[in-house]
């Protein structure tokens, strides 16, 4: 009688970082843990094999761990990132009373959102006491910062429903991210879906949004379009905004991973007092088009990546509505190339990037010998960066260092960064870092003149060295974090009041500005019960400068900021989310009691203010109904220049979502970006992998390349893992028996 051997289904029982472990047998870092086993292996499993594993049919372990979004596979593709701080997460704040990106970021202790109008129609992003020009803005890891002015940098054609997360990237040395970088990441709600949202409310507010996604095989597509308008909450504050955005990814079997995104935005808005507080009749119109293409490829121990991007921006500003005063036409082109090598001593990265900025304008740049259409001025400049970085993780420690040079019209500058981390206990991580950064003067800094302002062509780059310390702890449903920083800034650019120049603002560089800050945050989050989420945060900033001058922007930072968010669920399908925040801004502004008359003015200090927002929501199946109320207490406040912002504003809306498939998977890990964790995909799949998080520390650039098949050599060192899923409570669960449906293909969006 023949002795028939039955093929057994292997199963991982535990995880470790030993040299003989299964993933270590691959002789490479597992950058992303989707090691999908082919269907043939699953189908060949016999009943005997299933019976063999019957002793593990129960859930082996349930992990309740924090989730961190990943958008990069290489370690620092362009510049080293010391840490990644989450500012917004769509899943965690799905029920929060936020309608725009600005309202989503307003509660973060690291960010100061300064609006001039309602619903984020014109706003600036300030990071940790820096100015809006010192903030780099990234969309899915691509730099789309506007070279003319930071006012336009985050005017991106993306609505809040397409944004999966927003992260603050600390320690991005090089040209641009003087105070830090904000990375906005997009992802579909489901693998394949169609969604419509409509809302209306006070002040003639109306909003309509149509979005959807298609995932087929190795191809994924996300597309969205929206229209938002209002009659305004006071004279000349009406607005209209159109957005269109598309993102497509494709993973070729041999060519690598391709990521294409493109978008267009058109907005017009009344600008009552926006740029001169005494003038109520200003008006502005902007149009922005952007696109980028990114490629990623892994070959053995090497990882390669390249990207190219383009942003086009038109801006028309009327001092008096209907009479064009300034027109600007800006082009920003970028390209990037890098390579990583993973070896026994760590991961070494080498790369470079190039940026070209050009502007046609009616008053910015050098005068043209012959007008170019309606434009009489133009200016162009190019910058480049080269860098070398090495990172190493050893037991509970991680270290990284980088060195590079920046090539600008102002000469060659050397840049560096250092970082280290230590994980003394599960859930606890300590990190420290230092980095050097710089920012070039914008075209507005160099050339803008007006009846109240004088330009300065002698400006040079701003420079800073920043020191960071962070600590994070998480256990079960609780999380705590502490961050402190000190930024020593030199040659800071600001508009300075000069009586000796006819009582005008003059673009100048003060010699020193030191900024100190501390941020505390804590939260409690569960997936069920009455109380679902409570978060509390506090931020404090103080500065020290070596000159006693009247500056327009450097000294009106947010000194104190505290925020509380609470979310409760009741009556099965109802939820209520409330956010309460207190703001205390340093500095003063000039108040004009009579609109249109600059001769009467007085200096006022910024007053503390309190904001309370809420959302009541009902959801069943494909339908979600909600009522929003912002500034419920009808507080009178301003973010800058004495421009009053809206009082109580109520809106209501409906969202209909038809789709299938799970939401795109997320990477779950410990509270620190440098600590190791587990990959637990959403949905039921035969996969689970251990991640060495040092591979993506501070990425935020580039996409993770997904492994589509498990090579035979993998089985020489161990068997593949048991299936993973996420239960109804949102916990990662590791099972023992594979699903009969086989592996569902995850989305490539993050």
Where are these regions (language model features)?
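Short strand-turn segments of transmembrane beta-barrel domains in outer membranes
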Residues: 165, 173, 180-214, 225, ...
């Amino acid at each position: 009688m023949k002795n028939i051997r039955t093929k057994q289904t292997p199963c991982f029982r535990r995880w470790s970082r030993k040299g003989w472990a299964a993933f270590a047998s691959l002789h490479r870092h597992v950058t992303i843990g989707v090691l999908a086993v082919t269907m043939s292996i699953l189908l060949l499993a016999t009943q005997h094999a299933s019976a063999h594993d019957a002793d593990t049919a129960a859930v082996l372990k349930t992990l309740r761990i924090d989730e961190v979004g990943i958008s990069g596979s290489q370690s620092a593709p362009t510049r080293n990132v010391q840490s990644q701080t989450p500012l917004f997460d769509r899943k965690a704040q799905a029920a929060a009373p936020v309608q725009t990106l600005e309202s989503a970021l307003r509660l973060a202790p690291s960010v100061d959102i300064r609006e001039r109008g309602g619903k984020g129609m014109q706003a600036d992003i300030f990071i940790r006491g820096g100015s809006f020009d010192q903030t780099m803005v990234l969309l899915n890891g691509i730099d789309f910062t506007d070279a003319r002015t930071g006012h336009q940098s985050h005017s991106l054609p993306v609505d809040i429903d397409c944004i999966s997360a927003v992260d603050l990237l600390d320690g991005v040395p090089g040209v641009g991210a003087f105070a830090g970088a904000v990375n906005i990441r997009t992802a579909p709600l489901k693998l394949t879906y169609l969604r419509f949202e409509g809302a209306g409310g006070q002040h003639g507010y109306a909003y309509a949004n149509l979005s959807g996604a298609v995932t087929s095989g190795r191809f994924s597509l996300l597309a969205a379009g929206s229209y938002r308008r209002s009659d305004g909450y006071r004279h000349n504050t009406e607005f209209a905004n159109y957005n269109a955005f598309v993102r497509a990814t494709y993973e070729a079997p041999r060519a690598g991973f391709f990521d294409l995104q493109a978008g267009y935005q058109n907005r017009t808005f009344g600008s009552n007092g926006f740029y001169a507080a005494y003038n109520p009749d200003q008006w502005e119109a902007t149009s922005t088009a952007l696109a980028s293409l990114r490629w990623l490829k892994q070959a053995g121990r090497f990882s390669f990546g390249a990207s190219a991007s383009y942003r086009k921006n038109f801006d028309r500003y009327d001092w008096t509505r209907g009479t064009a005063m300034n027109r600007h036409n800006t082009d920003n082109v970028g390209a990037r190339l890098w390579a990583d090598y993973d070896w026994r001593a760590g991961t070494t990265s080498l790369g470079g990037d190039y940026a070209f900025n050009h502007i046609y304008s009616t008053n910015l740049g050098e005068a043209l010998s012959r007008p170019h259409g309606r434009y009489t001025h133009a200016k162009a400049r190019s910058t480049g960066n080269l860098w070398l970085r090495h990172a190493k993780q050893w037991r509970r420690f991680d270290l990284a260092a980088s060195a590079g040079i920046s090539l600008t019209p102002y000469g060659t500058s050397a840049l560096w960064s250092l970082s280290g981390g230590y994980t003394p206990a599960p859930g606890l991580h300590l990190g420290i870092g230092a980095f050097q950064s710089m920012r070039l003067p914008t075209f507005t800094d160099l050339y803008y003149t007006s009846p109240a302002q004088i330009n300065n062509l002698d400006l040079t780059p701003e420079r800073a060295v920043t020191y960071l310390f962070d600590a994070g702890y998480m256990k079960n449903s609780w999380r705590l974090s502490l961050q402190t920083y000190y930024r020593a800034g030199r040659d800071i650019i600001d508009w300075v009041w000069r009586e000796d120049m006819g009582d005008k603002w003059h673009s100048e560089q003060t010699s020193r500005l030191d900024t100190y800050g501390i941020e505390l945050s804590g939260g409690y989050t569960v997936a069920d019960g009455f109380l679902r989420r409570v978060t509390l945060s506090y931020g404090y900033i103080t500065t020290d400068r070596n000159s006693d001058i009247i500056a327009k922007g450097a000294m009106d930072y947010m000194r104190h900021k505290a925020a509380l968010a609470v979310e409760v669920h009741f009556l099965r399908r109802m939820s209520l989310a409330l956010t309460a925040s207190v703001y205390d801004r340093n500095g003063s502004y000039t108040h004009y009691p009579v609109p249109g008359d600059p001769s009467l003015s007085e200096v006022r200090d910024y007053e503390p203010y309190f904001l309370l927002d809420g959302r009541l929501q009902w959801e069943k199946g494909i339908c979600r109904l909600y009522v929003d109320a912002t500034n419920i207490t009808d507080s009178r406040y301003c973010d800058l220049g004495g421009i009053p912002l809206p009082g109580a504003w109520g809106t209501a809306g409906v969202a209909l979502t038809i789709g299938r498939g799970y939401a795109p998977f997320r990477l779950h890990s410990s509270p620190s970006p440098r600590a190791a964790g587990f990959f637990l995909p959403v949905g039921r799949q035969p996969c689970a992998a251990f991640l060495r998080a040092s591979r993506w520390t501070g990425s935020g650039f580039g996409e993770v390349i997904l492994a589509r098949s498990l090579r035979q050599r993998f089985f020489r060192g161990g068997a593949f893992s048991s299936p993973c899923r996420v239960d109804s409570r949102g916990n990662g669960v590791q099972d023992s028996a594979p699903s009969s449906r086989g592996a569902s293909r995850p989305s490539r969006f993050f």
